[in-house]
Amino acid sequence: MSKQTFTTTFAGKPLVVEVGQVAKQANGATVVRYGDSTVLTAAVMSKKMATGDFFPLQVNYEEKMYAAGKFPGGFMKREGRPSTDATLTARLIDRPIRPMFAEGFRNEVQVINTVLSYDENASAPMAAMFGSSLALSISDIPFNGPIAGVQVGYIDGEFIINPDKEQMEASLLELTVAGSKEAINMVESGAKELSEDIMLEALLKGHQAIQELIAFQEQIVAVVGKEKAEVELLQVDADLQADIVAKYNAQLQKAVQVEEKKAREAATEAVKEMVKAEYEERYAEDENLATIMRDVAEILEQMEHAEVRRLITEDKIRPDGRKIDEIRPLDAVVDFLPKVHGSGLFTRGQTQALSILTLAPMGETQIIDGLAPEYKKRFLHHYNFPQYSVGETGRYGAAGRREIGHGALGERALEQVLPSLEEFPYAIRLVAEVLESNGSSSQASICAGTLALMAGGVPIKAPVAGIAMGLISDGTNYTVLTDIQGLEDHFGDMDFKVAGTREGITALQMDIKIAGITPQILEEALAQAKKARFEILDVIEATIAEPRPELAPTAPKIDTIKIDVDKIKVVIGKGGETIDKIIAETGVKIDIDDEGNVSIYSSDQAAINRTKEIIAGLVREAKVGEVYHAKVVRIEKFGAFVNLFDKTDALVHISEIAWTRTTNVSDVLEVGEDVDVKVIKIDEKGRVDASMKALIPRPPKPEKKEEKHD
């Protein structure tokens, strides 16, 4: 296929798609140019069904530093593991694409997005999402798209689609919404305490804008789209399914209704093991035993799936016996740990998170050097999910995509209520350790983070709580669930996380397993989430009503002084010599910004005070008319040099020593002698002249003797 180009304009920027020129061996490939951002997307599919009980979809978003005219950092000067932003963008693209493949599709699919050029005012992630959908849609991969996504901002009561950098900085909302022509299927958002009504309107505005992008994709697919390949879907043997359902459905139904998680898991596992043992023995000699046992496992999973959903939609019974809008038992604790700067333990049913606060000087902020211009990140929220939290063994290592994503969600939720840098000049790190999990651990980490911040004396604007909403839908009827647990998340259709204060929403995240959800479902879920959020805030505020007025004794204290910008180099010294000497003497940490704000950190107030004295002395300037108690440091024929303070000397000319004539300076002064002097002149080069005699009353002139006349 020869190169074909398609052009339109979206949100005020040119959107150009090129097909047929590059990556022609992939099943589908596109080059998307949005503004001056260029993204190459290639989609490929394995020829055979993969083994395993899940759909092996891999979406990558690769930031090439040359796209922004930069060298990669590090010794190797080569791109390494994906940045946090790249990982989050890959997840952002994966989530709306995944539900658009048929149930039972098991061929491996890879979608690789490579950023070739970067324009900070034209969203490369949105171009990559568009390119991912289009590459799949024009390929022979059986993708039931297209989908598209947009960013939505909110400025002065107006919604902005795909805002540029300046607009996003002024926006009260940073929303990414994706979906198909019919419905929304992915949401990711941070917001400055916006109401449910505004958030819902933003979602609908975003979905409306998506239609234009989907229509453009459909136009391209009509011209260059390939016929979809026939692939084998994972389907179980119908006779085998009927046999197992008839024999064991009642036992599995009973096991599913055990309320306590561990007991329920043990009961369902016992039924499954009994079934597997029977059919493994029955078909032990069959050459297709592996396929039969795979089908048995899939049938049992489908039976459990169907029963959980039936109980909720028909009987309105949840696995743990709760009402549809009921939250699990809550508990909130502060000061769980000694020595740390703040800690909070939050428990919701069998989900528990411990959050630990650490405060540090601003010099500890994280430097982010990606495609965008380098910047410093003051607030970090890290989320850890050890396998023991679900009573299992498993790998331990660096944070995976899920942990990075959950940490970022908590960061967005809590960042909106943090004090400004001027109010609270600290770098802030929260670490959420998930100690138990039965669903919604990311929201528990937000609640625990609020407790830790307030216990640590961080003056947040308001406490934040989070809740996860679920959905069970059969296409006609649906049930929205409050505070979903693991089983409801696993077998449900939606995981809709909502975090916020009493004033409004600070973060949203939605993932679904069906093609999309309607505005009515969104509205109902937001309303239920608000009610639940307020219940959780009641518990948090009963534990700690407001941030403590003082920091923990172990937290670094801070004092700030202002110096002239041209004095920064004096405090730092050549090669950092002066500031290093101050730090070595006092044991403090010092940060100096470009505007001359000097922040001094230490747990010892005396050390802070001593540091302030030293710096004040370094930047002190002599002023004409001021009097100083000085020390003679050098004597010359023409006068004496005296030290006024620190490194500031002045010349007392021989004529300024006394009102009477001084013949030899050394007859009057000696090195080391203390004298009081007054500054009388500072020239354009900063040289200081001082006077001793200016502090001495001038003696009266002697009266002239009258001449006698004869």
Swiss-Prot record:
Mg(2+) binds at residues 489, 495. Residues 625-693 form the S1 motif domain. It catalyses: RNA(n+1) + phosphate = RNA(n) + a ribonucleoside 5'-diphosphate. Keywords: Cytoplasm, Magnesium, Metal-binding, Nucleotidyltransferase, RNA-binding, Transferase. Residues 556-615 form the KH domain. Its EC number is 2.7.7.8. Its main location: cytoplasm. GO terms for molecular function: 3'-5'-RNA exonuclease activity; magnesium ion binding; polyribonucleotide nucleotidyltransferase activity; RNA binding. Involved in mRNA degradation. Catalyzes the phosphorolysis of single-stranded polyribonucleotides processively in the 3'- to 5'-direction. This is Polyribonucleotide nucleotidyltransferase. The lineage of its organism: Bacteria, Bacillati, Bacillota, Bacilli, Lactobacillales.
